[in-house]
UniProtKB/Swiss-Prot annotation:
TM stretches of this protein: 550-570
Source organism of the structure: Aspergillus fumigatus (strain ATCC MYA-4609 / CBS 101355 / FGSC A1100 / Af293) (Neosartorya fumigata)
Topological domain spans for side Extracellular: 21-549
Lineage: Eukaryota, Fungi, Dikarya, Ascomycota, Pezizomycotina
Gene: fetC
Compartments, as annotated in UniProt: Cell membrane
Protein name as it appears in the record: Iron transport multicopper oxidase fetC
E.C. number(s) listed in UniProt: 1.-.-.-
């Protein structure tokens, strides 16, 4: 199915004549029926009865007022504006139980903030497991001071994603369960490009286009390339970079790139654009799954859409080598270092969970931001935020290093809300834990972004300044891992936040409708802030001696035993039929 690019991917911005404005959005979040891969029709989450949701275009300095009404009926919802710093508007960031309450069915939440950045972003639900069901889309912020103004003729937006046929509540129930003790993530059913397959994008010969690339998927990173065309990377995650040529890019879930691509001067043929899911992430490789999605640059409507050529190896550009245009130098030595070790393991309910330093994230009874605002001087003590939020309190202005050691055999894209960070070190695969006494020289002008990959059994070091008071999640952006607990909470300058931030009354009304507490510690205790009795916690640890393989063996042994007992019971309850008079009992032997 060909899709007209004007509907999904293209907008031409006369950037020199635009000015900041107040943009109003009135969104009704509803269920819609869609079949984006042409294989399976299913319910998806749309906006105002439409799916895919609209690609948004802002100008730097715009004020956004988005009224979000939950008309789903059977699920709560939320909207996270991915990549926006929300400096001074932490309560508009979007994650439920972190900076707001869940928007219950029938409730309306108003997001009201000013856009202070430019580049490529996206918006998506941050309610548990929800955005892969469709509530996600690209967002682009233009800027008259964009360093590449005048070097391109038009802009295009290309989203990449994986796609599932089952809805997320069903998938999550089986994923986080005793029947999946190894934590094998569900494998997608398809890859999509702009929420479809066989996308066509009309181009004109000789023109240069600025392509905004966004991975809005739940799980799969994708390799992306355009046959017989060179891309020049000029932006990652809202950070403009010096142009770097690339033939292939690796885009993890939540990452964004802007690339300049100059068209050929002839129109005899069209060229394939390919997104290829990284199958290293998958525990199983279904024979029926096409890991690739193809679109085409259409120079000539009458010419064929060629089948992409096979590639002998995936060799993407290494984003560590990118250099920001603004020349921000390496921050000074860290005032505070946070070391996070990533593991996957089972807890007492038999299910597999994800951990930072042995802690799996569990949402508190009171949103963490609301705890900050209602605990007075105790807000500087991590204990009030609950053990399983993995709280880390930062002082304003401190330089912070995040040292992450990946003890897992898979890749992980990690995202920090409220900031971009300098990526000052990143190891190869199987390098083990970071050794501060034995590392290469840090780059003088490090690459910055808000989502970065750690390699299997590898490590990285991120550095940022705590200059944005707020409550900011740091989490894996593979949705399966986020939902199984791979998250921590940075509480940045909490006492400053108390002086400057006020929650709007309509936000409290949303909390009341959802039955969410809005004051006190993580357990909702307002009298004794250090009494966490009743706080939400993870399942108890697994009894000593149990392993994932042991659980599998135990589960199947129990199933086999139950089936055996049922068979015996069924046989024992069956009626015994005596031979009729005059009949001859059967005899299996063959006698003559």
């Amino acid at each position: 199915m060909a899709v007209g690019f004007l509907l999904l991917t293209a907008f031409v911005v006369n950037i020199l004549t635009t000015s900041a404005a107040t943009l109003h959005y009135d969104w009704n979040i509803t269920w819609v029926t869609a079949n984006p891969d042409g294989q399976f029709e299913r319910p998806v989450i749309g906006i105002n009865g439409q799916w895919p949701p609209p690609v948004l275009s802002f100008t730097r300095g715009d004020r956004i007022i988005a009224k979000v009404h939950n008309a789903l009926g059977n699920e709560t919802t939320s909207v996270h504006w991915h990549g926006f710093f929300q400096n001074g508007t932490n309560h508009m960031d979007g994650p439920p139980s972190v900076t707001q309450c869940d928007i219950a069915p029938g409730s309306t939440f108003v997001y009201n903030f000013t856009v202070e950045q430019s580049g490529t972003y996206w918006y998506h639900s941050h309610t548990k497991g929800q955005y892969p069901d469709g509530l996600r889309q690209a967002l682009v912020v233009t800027d008259p001071k964009n360093p590449y103004i005048g070097q391109y003729d038009e802009e295009r937006v290309i989203s990449l994603s994986d796609w599932y046929h089952d809805q997320m509540p069903t998938l999550l129930k089986s994923f986080i369960s005793i029947s999946n003790p190894t934590g094998a993530e569900p494998v997608p059913k398809a890859a999509l490009m702009n929420d479809t397959q066989n996308l066509t994008v009309a181009v004109e010969p000789g023109k240069t286009y600025l392509f905004h690339l966004v991975n809005v998927g739940a799980f799969a990173s994708q390799y992306f390339w355009i046959e017989d065309h060179t891309m020049k990377i000029v932006e990652v995650d809202g950070v403009w970079t010096h142009a770097s040529e690339a033939n292939m890019i690796y885009i993890a879930s939540a990452q964004r790139y802007s690339v300049l691509v100059t068209m050929k001067n002839e129109t005899s043929q069209n060229y394939a654009m390919v997104g290829s899911m990284d199958t290293d992430l998958f525990d199983t490789l279904p024979e029926s799954l096409n890991y690739n999605v193809t679109g085409w640059l259409m120079y000539n409507d009458q010419a064929d859409k060629p089948t992409p050529a096979l590639v002998s190896a995936f060799e993407p550009y290494d984003d560590f080598n990118l250099v920001p245009v603004d020349g921000m130098a390496l921050h000074k030595e860290a005032d505070y270092t946070v070391t996070l070790d990533v593991t996957m393991d089972n807890l007492g309910d038999g299910a597999n969970y994800a951990f930072f330093n042995g802690i799996t994230y569990v949402m508190p009874k009171v949103p963490t931001l609301y705890s900050v605002l209602t605990t007075g001087s105790a807000a500087t003590d991590p204990a009030v935020y609950g053990y399983n939020t993995h709280p880390i309190v930062l002082k304003r202005g401190d330089i912070v290093d995040i040292v992450l050691n990946n003890d897992d055999a898979g890749k992980h894209p990690f995202h920090l809300h409220g900031h971009t960070f300098q990526v000052i070190a990143r190891s190869e695969e199987n390098a083990g834990h970071y050794d501060p006494s034995n590392h290469t020289t840090f780059p003088s002008i490090p690459m910055r972004r808000d989502t970065v990959i750690v390699r299997p059994q590898g490590n990285f070091v991120l550095r940022f300044q705590a200059d944005n008071p707020g409550v900011w999640l740091f989490h894996c952006h593979i949705e399966w891992h986020m939902d199984s607990g791979l998250a921590a909470t940075f509480i940045e300058a909490p006492l400053d936040l108390q002086k400057t931030l006020k929650i709007p009354e309509d936000h409290y009304q949303v909390c009341e409708a959802s039955g969410t507490l809005t004051a006190g510690n993580a357990a909702g205790n307002t009298k004794d802030l250090f009494d966490l009795t009743g706080q939400n916690v993870s399942p108890a640890p697994l009894p000593a001696g149990f392993t994932a393989k042991g659980i599998v063996a135990l589960v199947f042994s129990c199933v086999a035993a139950i089936l055996g007992l049922l068979s015996i019971a069924w046989y024992g309850m069956a009626p015994i039929t005596a031979p009729r008079a005059g009949s001859t009992p059967s005899n299996d032997s063959d006698e003559n």
